[in-house]
């Protein structure tokens, strides 16, 4: 008799949990594309004899696959602008490359969602400097840089959405050649999902 009661209880629990979990396993497989623009800020150590401008205009283009209403896979290209320093030494540091990220979404209502993202990115850090007109520490390196981000999306329609996001790319560059820097990106984007 206890076995019957236990089986009945388990069946009831499964039937109650099914509506809550069905959405997560309900695949939509909807492709999407998007473009964003914003401002990147470089976490640089500015030499005492130089003046640094550590922010610049940045942009991204991306595409991916919405697996279900909660998870999407995204691949893109990011140009994070460049930081400039003038004085002694003077020069630039710029970052660009390929982004590979997993995007999570949680709908507050049909029009508004919160977004979280993380990924493994293949970014190139290029540093070019001069001292008294002579090239100095001109180095470049492409390496893996991890990233995290938070944001929100407002849906104008079933297919078109607007996003506002903050992202941080950690340890861009190589510690032994270019040195490593963190880059923050604040951006707004338009995304189109093929539904």
Write out the residue ranges for each language-model feature:
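A short beta-strand motif that forms part of the nucleic acid-binding face
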Residues: 120, 144, 168
